[in-house]
Amino acid sequence: MVSEIFDPDAWESVTDEFDDITYHRGVDAPVVRIAFDRPEVRNAFRPGTVDELYAALDHARKQADVGCVLLTGNGPAESDGGWAFCAGGDQSVRGDSGYEYRDDDEAGDEDDPLVREARAGRLHILEVQRLIRFMPKPVVAVVPGWAVGGGHSLHVVCDLTLASEEHAKFLQTDPDVGSFDGGFGSAYLAKQIGQKKAREVFFRGKTYSAAEAADMGMVNEAVPHEELEAVARKWAEEMTAKSPTAMRMLKYAFNMADDGMVGQQVFAGEATRLAYMTEEAQEGRDAFLEKRDPAFEEYPWHY
């Protein structure tokens, strides 16, 4: 069983090579479902988990026939029936400088001692955050249970969040374990819910329900638990019916207001690519290759 609320008829496996996550594609929809699959530890991530998550997200990014990513957590845990989206970094593998590969991890078999040393302490969940942020398609956090610490920050960086009315809980524990997300997890949360409320979330370490999270603006909608994945799929199908170019440009336009020069570069790069597709730009290219002056006079100066 993938997850208790997973519909096996709606999805097909992309690969079974992952240990800590599952990766499925919609049978009849251009949507993928990527899920943490460590329910017994509330879907906490270790370095190998992050490697797999990055690989799956990057694969989805490159698929021209995939328009939306659902990011969720499988469950419940067999031991106590608990649900989780992600409980953040697995503290049992946290070393002095970050999260450490163990000898039974694939990356723990690295022969190059310099690579092993560089991997001694990882915090590369931040690379996943950036990948989600710059993904040219919507990423929806589908939260069936606990979103804690680094898992809380992951849902924050996603474009949208849907949460289980009954089981979703939002808790920021970073200061409790001597950690802090000084980037998207905190600053972007403040953009979503306001400075005072975001500081409360981090400074108090209070648990919030799905309804409370929706009221403050960090969750789009609280959904009955049994309907959560079906509603997420419906939202994804609505979004993938839109213009891919418009959706990509809209996401980058929303990002640009908060992402500084990097956001401008991403948006401008996409605008340049659109310009390349015009006859006017192609005339400039052809004139250069043919060693002649471009005939731009036939193109109007739009206003």
Regions found by a protein language model. Name each.
Residues 38-39, 242-243, 291:
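Short loop-to-helix capping motifs
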Residues 80, 163-168, 219-266, 273, ...:
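C-terminal long alpha-helix characteristic of the crotonase
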Residues 41, 73-128, 176-178:
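Glycine- (often His-adjacent) and acidic-residue-rich active-site loop
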Residues 125, 186, 195-198, 247-250, ...:
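A general structural signal for well-ordered alpha-helical segments in protein cores
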Residues 34, 71, 90, 154-156, ...:
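Hydrophobic/aromatic residues within transmembrane alpha-helices
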Residues 1-79:
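Conserved CoA-thioester-binding segment of acyl-CoA-metabolizing enzymes
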Residues 269, 277-281, 287:
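Interdomain hinge/lid region at the active-site interface
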Residues 130-244, 278:
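Crotonase-fold acyl-CoA enzyme core
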